[in-house]
Amino acid sequence: MSSNALTILTAFALAFAALSTVLVGAYGGRRARTTSDFLVASRAVGPRWNAAAISGEYLSAASFLGVAGLVAKYGADALWYPVGFTAGYLGLLLFVSAPLRRSGAYTVPDFAEFRLGSTRLRTVAMLVVVVICVFYLVPQYQGAGLTLKILLGLPVWIGPVAVGTIVIANVVGGGMRSITFVQAFQYWLKLTAIAVPALALLALFLSDRAELGGPLPPSVQQQTTVTIDTNVVVQVAEPAGITVSGTVNDRAVNNATLPAPGRYTLGEGTTLTLAAGAATPVVAGAPNTGREWISSGGGLGGEHPLYQVLSIIVATFLGTMGLPHVLVRFYTNPDGRAARRTALAVIALLAAFYLFPTLLGVFARLYVPQLLITGTADAAVLLLPNAAIGGVVGAGLAALVAAGAIAAFLATSSGLLVSIAGALSTDVLRGRIRDFRLAAVVGGVVPIPLALAASSLELSRSVGLAFAVAASTLCPLLVLGIWWRGLTSGGAISGLLVGGGLSGVATTLAVIGGVDDGMLAGWPATLIGYPAAITVPLAFLTMIVVSRLTASTAPPDVAGIFARMHVPERLGMGIERLPRDSP
């Protein structure tokens, strides 16, 4: 298939995904009239429908593109991301979902005020919610820019603007009621879009003799040319078949060969030509040989791999319990029992999905290894079907993947924007429907420049940092607020400030470029890139210690509050907390 025909087919698939999102959102939001409709879909969403919607919004750019990219680049240690993303719902199922729904709250800040009776705590929680959602929106917009650039050759800024516009239109039109339909539909679209190519490539792999765990990096199957967009350091295991034009180790070369294995710095604009069968250079910090890639313990680039893995587990498992756009969906269930059933169903849906990006990451290393040269492995899922299969079938699979990628950005962005709008409209503005819509517009626009600034950060790493902030703030607030009677507003505020401040600073530094990897044996760079293993325990400890010191300020009716959260609804203790309806 010609490149023009492929571009047209891909553009059609992207347009289909975007248009179907708008139409499904309009259908879902056609009856949205009240504040309850916009914030919690009138608490009338059943477990199966809600589970599909939660899975649809949770499977973000990091899940659809980033997991496969990390597996292709780093191998076995990258599997902790999908494991943690899924296992986090076990924590939600056991500790949070039912008590949170029984509280009657409609946002996380509202739960904070319900539990501890502090408007100051509510304000701090609102700020934390907005920060987490903005940090999480950044990789969604970032992934949209990458997708349109790779598939259609469009400027990077068009992706964030297009996704932002569509999401704002959906959220403004019907709030939670609208995006519930959108997200449930998009889960099945994403599952189809990633499962069909993965199974097709699995059939190709089973008939292939390619080796994953060999002593060399993967080799290209045909002559391949790679252009370096930014300066990069690569590790060359076997220089045979590689010629370079441009800048190597700050020296200008023209159609030169590399003299020996080793590390080389390639300057911007440098072109590498790999003959068919040549071993691919690999970006420094990633596993070089097949044996290194298939073995665990190497981490995800940089120093201190064991700490990296531990921090990833903490961030993904506990961060899920602190994601505002996930938590708010449990407010839409009719009762606590339905919330628990929803969380259980989500675990099954996510487990089914994450099998396929893992497979695609393995196949990407075999069939598009040239991505390992620049380290831009997030593009692997987008390029893999056409590169490995080719022809009409490959083009069709590539278009299907493109539709799924756009669905991933739109679904997650919709949930995040509802959380931002709900927090701002009820805690900063007057809680009217028009305030919700205004907050949605502002919340959708602000992350666009941040996404453009963070374009060099891998998608799963970007999302992992947002998880670290959530795990360091709202997770301790919810776990201690639901299960420990001794929590006070002073302790909660102190923990939010300590956990949020430290993880927020680390995330900001990581987005703008971090620090030198060689400083102090690599610890500053590692702590900035993976802060959760430090910031989460500090947040819990701060809340407990300060609460002990301020025990006299604990709410006097804590027994009644706990009864409301933990006693089944059929005993009649529940009270719904919703702002007054107004246009």
For each feature predicted by the language model, list its residue ranges.
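Membrane-embedded helix-loop-helix hairpins and adjacent transmembrane boundary segments
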Residues: 1-583
